[in-house]
């Protein structure tokens, strides 16, 4: 089995359905003998360019280990899900379990917000 990193972008109106989508994709991988090494919900972020007249979308990153059949099934699910605006699947050499640079940035932003709120409260 090979390791893959999958990033998909979900329509912002469907953001509340993202946890269910993640669970469905995780169950697809695990039911066929694969493993999910990392799941990151990056949240709503600004798009680099407009997609379907949208400026923001919900980003999700998955690091998985699976076979070709499972990957083909996932790709089919992404293509025919109207809520998924774009997806990218990249083969990696090893399993990535550490937080991605994007998650480190999100954590840093949240820490700044928390510090600002405690400063205002004081």
From Swiss-Prot:
- From the UniProt record, give one GO term of the biological process aspect: translation
- CDD domains to which the protein is assigned, alphabetical: bS6
Stretches for region Disordered? 99-122
Among InterPro entries, the record links this protein to: Ribosomal_bS6, Ribosomal_bS6_sf, Ribosomal_S6_plastid/chlpt, Transl_elong_EF1B/ribsomal_bS6
Annotated keywords: Ribonucleoprotein, Ribosomal protein, RNA-binding, rRNA-binding
GO CC terms: cytosolic small ribosomal subunit
Cystine connections: none
* The keyword Zinc is assigned to this record: no
One annotated GO molecular function is: structural constituent of ribosome
UniProt cross-references to Pfam families, sorted A to Z: Ribosomal_S6 (PF01250)
- Carries keyword RNA-binding? yes
SUPFAM superfamilies (alphabetical): Ribosomal protein S6 (SSF54995)
Q: What does this protein do?
A: Binds together with bS18 to 16S ribosomal RNA.
The family line of this record is: Belongs to the bacterial ribosomal protein bS6 family.
Protein name as it appears in the record: Small ribosomal subunit protein bS6
Q: Which organism is it from?
A: Ralstonia pickettii (strain 12J)
Q: Which gene encodes it?
A: rpsF
């Amino acid at each position: 089995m090979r390791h893959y990193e999958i990033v998909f972008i979900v329509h912002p109106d469907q953001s509340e359905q993202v946890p269910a989508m993640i669970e469905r994709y995780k169950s697809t991988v695990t039911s066929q003998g694969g493993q999910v090494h990392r799941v990151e919900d990056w949240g709503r972020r600004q798009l680099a360019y407009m997609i379907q007249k949208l400026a923001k979308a919900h980003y999700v990153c998955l690091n998985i280990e699976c076979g070709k059949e499972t990957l083909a099934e996932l790709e089919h699910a992404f293509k025919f899900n109207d809520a998924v605006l774009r997806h990218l699947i990249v083969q990696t050499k090893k399993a990535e379990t550490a937080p991605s640079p994007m998650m480190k940035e999100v954590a840093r932003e949240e820490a700044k917000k928390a510090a600002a709120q405690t400063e205002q409260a004081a």
